[in-house]
Amino acid sequence: FQKMVYTTYINILWKRGINMRDKDCIFCKIAAGEIPSATLYEDDDFRVILDLGPASKGHALILPKEHFRNLYDIDDELAAKAMVLAKKMVKKLTDVLGCDGYNIVQNNEECAGQTVFHFHMHLIPRYKGDQVGLEWKVGELTDEVRDEILEKMK
């Protein structure tokens, strides 16, 4: 019952635009230093750690210390800081690892592959010939679909 009340309270705060740490969120605990991690970088807003289930050597995660469910919830200033931090980390990791490229991945909601509901960014080093699969079938943008989307976006 207490967990249900706490979760309801957090949801009400989120709807009001007030974010706070979720006591049951594994990434909140890691970001706060309550759970040990291989920390590559830390500041007042973020912790960057090595992923325990890496897609490739050097796969890292950027975790904000404040709890946001996903990109829809994070405030603009912190989202911008996350991207600047991603750039900084990718440059440093490329120098250290000698990788050939990078994927920066950020999933939102279960259907898009989000498994931990705390905003985070994956920094995935890529190496020539690696078997990391981040591809999708290329479709075709028809005139009808293009026009429909453009109209709805006005």
Residue ranges and their predicted role:
Residues 6-154:
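HIT superfamily nucleotide-processing domains
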Residues 2-3:
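Charged/polar low-complexity intrinsically disordered segments
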